[in-house]
């Protein structure tokens, strides 16, 4: 069984003006596709062939891990975004954020700050730890919470390819627009899982 590039949950131009169709074409159509292609080439004829993406991530290292994790991370990222989304969360997500960070405004400020200052790392995540508390963590390269006991709820990709076409070197601008796209329904499903 080989992996395929998962379909985007929206049209390539659906996130404009926050993320352009051109950025999606390169980020999804080139970067994400390359990780899928590389992973398939690396696992062909190995013990990883036929395993799920999550099984590969939890039991591999090196190039296999990097490509598998990037496929998973990017798929998760695309699902964290939605057109006509954003705003503040409601329900259980709002309650969990308030319990862990004091308020949505405090969480948003801390998450944005972590992502802006994330120069050694490439992904910033909101996770639910095994004790039920929410936390903001950053992972480097292809790092993913799947290798820990934390449950990923939300992520932002802060590799330059995620924003350079639209925002050049202005990562804060990208983060400001990210909040207009956050798919809180997806976050709620992850929290409930």
What are these language model-derived features?
Residues 1-193:
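Feature for soluble, non-membrane regions of globular proteins
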């Amino acid at each position: 069984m080989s992996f395929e590039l998962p379909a985007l949950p929206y049209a390539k131009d659906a996130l404009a003006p926050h993320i352009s169709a051109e950025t999606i074409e390169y980020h999804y159509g080139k970067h994400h596709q390359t990780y899928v292609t590389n992973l398939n080439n690396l696992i062909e004829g190995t013990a990883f062939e036929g395993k799920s993406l999550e099984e590969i991530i939890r039991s591999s290292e090196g190039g296999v891990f990097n490509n598998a994790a990037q496929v998973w991370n990017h798929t998760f990222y695309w699902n964290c975004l939605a057109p006509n989304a954003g705003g503040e969360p409601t329900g259980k997500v709002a309650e969990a954020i308030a319990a862990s960070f004091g308020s949505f405004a405090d969480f948003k400020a801390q998450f944005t700050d972590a992502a802006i200052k994330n120069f050694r790392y490439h992904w910033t995540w909101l996770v639910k730890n095994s004790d039920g508390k929410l936390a903001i963590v950053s992972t480097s390269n292809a790092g993913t919470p799947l290798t820990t006991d934390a449950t990923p709820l939300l992520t932002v990709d802060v590799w330059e390819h995620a924003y350079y076409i639209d925002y050049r070197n202005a990562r804060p601008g990208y983060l400001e627009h990210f909040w207009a796209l956050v798919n809180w329904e997806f976050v709620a499903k992850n929290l409930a899982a």
